[in-house]
Amino acid sequence: MDIKRVCLLLLIVVGAVGAVGAWCQASTFWLGADISGTTELEAKGVQIYNAKGEPRENTALMKELGMNMIRLRVWVNPKDGFSSKEDVLVMAKRAKELGMAIMIDFHYSDWWADPGKQNIPQAWKDYNYEQMKQALARHTRETLQLLKANGIDVKWVQVGNETTNGFLWPMGRAQEHMDQYAGLTDAGYAAVKEVYPQATVIVHLDCACDPHRYDFIFDGLRKYGARFDMIGVSVYPYWDMDSKLVNDWHETVEKFAANLRRISQKYGVETMVVETGVEAKKPVEGKVILKEIINAAKHHTDGHCHGVIYWAPELEGQYPLGAFENHRPTVIMEAFTEAAAEKE
């Protein structure tokens, strides 16, 4: 019997999505990395190796480590060209050749966007609200059309990066202009669906252990009619402890899993850990923590979390949460290899 019909019948009989949702969802649990900085490292002459010291291209190494997808950020007009739509195409082609799924992460900025900064692109700085929606939609469409024209399939699209406080400030700052943040988000949603109707559109927030910020944003988006298909979360025990949100990493794991169960039920959408990371200087402990994050996402969210993505594992130096040393993966990355070997 067709599995979709079985699921539909069960839903009708049981009358509750949660009772059978985990069984009916697609069996693939996605394991991935945001390796957007790869081409910049290559331009600097950096050679990446596997743990044995054999030269590797970064995308291929991620697959070798057990990953089945990658995440790529897009900036509007980056001054050096990295993370432009053309740069994203370079990386997307590599992923396609390897049979890996692709997530596109729109920052809607010329540079980094996160809860502490969501700067309007320089070319858009004088736009009014309607013009801003049009610019956002145009940028979204043009980027995705470039990918589609080159035979790239995009499975997920983030409309904004860690938009805990909205984006495109001050116009889209959620605390002051939730209606405009919602309108801008919905403009992005519509643009994605024009190009990739089947793509899953994600709204992404930080600090998955804190339910209050999720209620604030998603209650607001629902109030003003913004559409989204999935909630993306960041899970960083290191930053949670630094911000005094938790006492230890165990608390982060427990609280993020509980929050994902809660928001999937409250808002009727699926979830994904679209960013995570652990301390690079503590690789053995880091592997343990990452294994627990993956395990919690996969087995303790009532089947409503669809994957875990490590942010910039190849990044070394001042960034404390990479997973490489001397341009080689540490034991931290074994958590993905072991998770990939686990039977569904």
Cite the ranges covered by each PLM segment.
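Bacterial N-terminal signal peptides that target proteins for export
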Residues: 1-10
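Active-site cleft segment of glycoside hydrolase catalytic domains centered on the general acid/base Glu
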Residues: 84-87, 114-221, 226-228, 240-258, ...
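Active-site beta-loop-alpha junctions enriched in small/polar residues
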Residues: 36-38, 75-77, 107-109, 159-164, ...
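Aromatic-rich peripheral "rim/lid" segments of glycoside hydrolase catalytic domains that contact
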Residues: 43-47, 112, 262, 280-292, ...
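Boundary/entry segment of secreted carbohydrate-active catalytic domains
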Residues: 25-58
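Bacterial N-terminal signal peptides
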Residues: 9-18
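Hydrophobic faces of well-ordered beta-strands that scaffold small-molecule active sites
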Residues: 31-33, 70-72, 102-106, 155-159, ...
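Aromatic-lined substrate-binding rim segments of carbohydrate-active enzymes
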Residues: 54-113, 175-198, 249-254, 258, ...
